[in-house]
Each structure stands twice: as C-alpha cells, then as structure tokens.
Amino acid sequence: MANPQTLLALILTAAAPLAAAAHETDETHPQAAYTDLDYETPGYTLNINSNNPVVQQMQPTFKFGGYIMEKYSYSDRSGQTTNGGFDTRFVRLYMDGKVYQDFYYKLQMEVNGQPGVDKGPRIVDAFVEWQKYDCFRVKLGQFKRSFGFENPYSPLNVGLGSYSQATMKIASISDRIGEHKSSGRDVGVQVQGDLFPAADGHKWLHYQIGFFNGQGINHTDIDHHKDLIGGLWFSPLKNLAIGGFGWNGKYTNEAYNPNNPNSMRSAKRVRWGAGLKYEDKWTVRGEYMSSVGGVVSNATLPDRSDAWYLTLGVPVAKDVKVYGRYDCYRDAKTWNSLIANYGLSGNYYLGKNLIFQLNYTFTDNRSARRAAVPTDSRYNTIDVQVTARF
C-alpha cells in the first residue's frame, strides 16, 4: 500500500494542469460510433501531465460524462388514476478511465427521483476491470448482470422508449421476483473474454460468467448463497451474435414478515435465455427467456413465467432510425396471462448529443381481461422523449 507521502504526491499532481479533449468528430451514423452499447456517452477526457514518477507509472486517464432524458406520455387506458404526464426518466453522471494501462474503472450515479429507501440519488455502477487480455478479463464491483443481450444496453441505445418486458421482468431491470429497483445490476465478480479472431478482426466466440450476491445494487449479501450467471455466444459474422444465457440464483426477502402468510422468506431464480443480435446501421435483436421462482411479496402469485421479443431497426435517413418491436410477457407462463406490446419508434439524432424520440405502443393485456375484476385490456400509449448527453 502507498505511504502517505506518495498519496499526497498523487493528490497534488492530480491538481496539476489538465488537458480536456474535445468530443469525437466521427461523421458516421450517430450509433455507429458506439459499438459497445453499454457505454453511455462520448464524455470529456482529462489527461494528467506530470513529471512525478508515480503518476507517470500509473498513466491515469479520466473521462466525465452524463445524460438527461425527459419524457411526456399519454395513454387512453380507462380506469387509471392518470392518463400520463411529464417525467424525468434519467439523470445520470459518470466517471471512468484507466490506470496502469490495464485497469479500467467506472463510477456512475443516477441522481433523479424522490429520495427514499432505494430511491433518489444512488450509485448504479462502481467497478474495476482488469483488461490486459481480450481473452480473459476480470471485473469486480457493482455492474450489469451477465444475463441477456439487451440488459447491458444503455437506455440511449435500446432504440425504443423502454426495454423489452423480458429484460424488465426476467433480466432484472425491474425484476418480477420483488427485488428493489436495481437496473439489471448486482454486486459481484465476473470473468469474460473473446476468443478466436477472424480475418476481419472480430472474435468468433464470447464467454462471460459471474458470481453475484443476488440482492441487487447497493445492498450487502444476507444469505449463504451466491448467484451464478453466465452467457456464451457465437459470432459467425461481424456485428452478429447468437447465443444463450443461464442464471442459478436466489433472492432473500429483506422485508420478510413471518406474520403474513403471503410473505416469502426467499425465492429461487432459475432462468435461461437464448437469442441473437445484429447491431450496425440496421438492428435485429430477439430473445426468449424463461424463469422459475415466485414473488417474495405474494406467495400466491405464479412461480413460472416467460417472455420474448423481436426488435427491428431500420435507418431511413442519415440521422433518422425507425424501430419496431413485438414484445410479449406471460407472468404465469400461460396464454391467458399474456401481455403483448406492439411498438413503433422514430429516433432523430441531432448531432451526437441530442436524441429526439417519438414512441407508440399498442398493448393487448389478456391477464387484465381475464382478471377477477377485469380492467381495460386494449389501449394505446404515446410518448415523446428528449435526451441531451455530454
């Protein structure tokens, strides 16, 4: 561990002159610059210029960025307390960079929302990854669970106004099991890598496997079980991936009430999924996911569910891309519990830092139609989203 004099030298040299790099100036289609779609924004890069030997050895880099996503929505579903309104969907700030060339770090915060337990400003990403070898990288901290193709995507790159129901309910953006909002993330360690380079430079095979607490973000482990999550996919062509994912885990109910017969102490998360993605100027993305495990807040709810979706994105002009999605979720893994969303979205990119999005969704909710007290089951939703990033 560094002595106090070395730490002081690092602090002082970090305050030395910083050079801010401008945004990238790639003039290709706005999304073409972001091949790693869990990356948030181009950001601003700061490089430390110092004669201190410790700093020269570390070669630290810092990048700062963030985005604001505002939304207005309207729904014609009857019987609801509101038909829509304005919403600040995301305000996120991040810092990332490298030290010693091979160690990548990232800290990301979500700073919108009303303060409260698991609400309001909070850390969403906080990890370090050793990246010396493409074939073997090790990540430690709080980050996205390695389940599903869509889960790692930034909200900026999904293409529609929301994630699919499969990603929301089963890949744990907003997990059906009753976990607090964790945005598809957990605390743990993951090993991943890319193997067998092709002639065009892309790798034929990707693997990832991780051990996680199973309690979501910003929560410590409270049981003796660790979640095992992994994925494996094959890339026969550049930008095309075909593969599958598995999850063997358990969630322990932190709000368990022994006096409530419907409250469960824990629920297992045994899940698998398979799908494909193609990301370039055109987008094709589809997955099927299946889950075994109940809902900790209500033991009477089904313990088996599944979901699937198909997304197609078509560039219609240099700065305009249109997406369509067929999106299904069955909470009881029966056709009577099917919720089907048919979505259409237009994305306009004004430069690299402004995104205007118009989304339309028609929902056919069989579970609402067949409930003991039926509610409106066929309805339309329109929303407009504007994102500014830096």
Outline where the language-model segments fall.
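Transmembrane beta-barrel architecture of outer membranes
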Residues: 88-90, 121-125, 186-188, 225-231, ...
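N-terminal periplasmic/intermembrane-space "pro-region" immediately following the signal or transit peptide
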Residues: 2-69, 390
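Outer membrane beta-barrel
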Residues: 51-214, 222-229, 233-242, 311-314, ...
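Outer membrane beta-barrel transmembrane domains
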Residues: 313-315, 319-353, 357, 361
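Sequence/structural signature of outer-membrane beta-barrel proteins
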Residues: 71-78, 110-116, 147, 198, ...
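Detector for outer-membrane/organellar transmembrane beta-barrel domains
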Residues: 42, 57, 233-332
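Outer-membrane beta-barrel "beta-signal"
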Residues: 348, 362, 376-390
